[in-house]
Each structure stands twice: as structure tokens, then as C-alpha cells.
Amino acid sequence: MALPYDPDSWPANWILQLIAKDRLKEFYLSTHWKRFRLRLLKSRPCRCQLCEQKEPAVLTPLRKPWEKKSDSNDRRPVAIVHHINEVRHRPDLALSEYDEHGEPNTIIVCPGCHWDEHHKRKIPVTEERW
């Protein structure tokens, strides 16, 4: 279980410095992230957790990044590890499977659901009157 948020802890301090320099991509290229991501992908089923929650449930089989396509008809998308608590908002949880309440901080998703999570349509502040 993670401890309460501490911006002076590692990796939070390092990630905040990267964000300030607009170089957050360096975190995702780091050995720390690659090892963490690899461990998660090896230990969890390779299915989109968000597709499974849809009604009706959709089982989206995913390909692990190191797997080659089995043939030219292999259309499985590559699995993505998604942070539920965005790294920009909770850098202390960047390398944690769970948050301080024991809730999952990372999930395996397909590229479509990952895009949807990062580009959610914002709810308008005022009611649309068209």
C-alpha cells in the first residue's frame, strides 16, 4: 500500500522536475518504468480491463509488446499499462500498482480504451440549449 502523497519523495520529486521541464516522456523511456510495466504485463491477464466492464462485456485479446504477430492476419492490438491516477497529478504513484487506499492504480487496456481515457468528452458547465 502506498503512503500519503509526498512531493519530496522519489519518484515524485524526479517526475515533478521532468514535468516542469516539459520532459515527462523521459519517465516513460526510463528503465524504472520499463521494468515496472514489464512486471505488470507478465503478471496480469492480457485483456483490456475496460472492455470487460462494458455492457455487454467485450473480451479484447491483446498482444504483449514483446510478442510478434503470429501471422499477417493477427489483428490483436498491443496491451498498454494505464495509470488510473495520472502521473502528472500523482507522481508518487507512478511506479505503484495500488494507491494509498489499496485501490488499483494501473490497469491493462487496449489502445482504443486508452485513447478514450485520455480524451474523455468534458461535461459542459452550462446546459446546452440547442
Indicate where each model-derived feature is located:
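Short Cys/His-centered divalent metal-binding micro-motifs
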Residues: 53-57, 103-128
